Amino acid sequence: MPMPVLIFLIGYLPFFLAAYWIYDMESVRKQAITAGAILSFDAAMLAIFGGILGWI
């Protein structure tokens, strides 16, 4: 598999799928909750892997 395809599948595709999923939600409240949950997860992983474990 060529490298650009792999980068697209691993890097870009999940982002675009999540963006489409959030955009198509029925209410702005659901969009905000879902986007906030994703942001909270990212912040928690950054704190764990960067701050506590020192990997970043």
From Swiss-Prot:
Location in or out of the cell: Cell membrane
Please verify whether the record's keywords include Transmembrane: yes
What are the TM regions of this chain, as residue ranges? 5-23, 33-55
Give a GO cellular-component term. plasma membrane
Topology of this chain in the membrane: Multi-pass membrane protein
The principal location of this protein is: membrane
Which keywords appear in this protein's UniProt record, sorted alphabetically?
A: Cell membrane, Membrane, Transmembrane, Transmembrane helix
Q: Which domain of life is it from?
A: Archaea
Protein name, as recorded: Uncharacterized protein AF_1327
Native organism taxonomy: Archaea, Methanobacteriati, Methanobacteriota, Archaeoglobi, Archaeoglobales
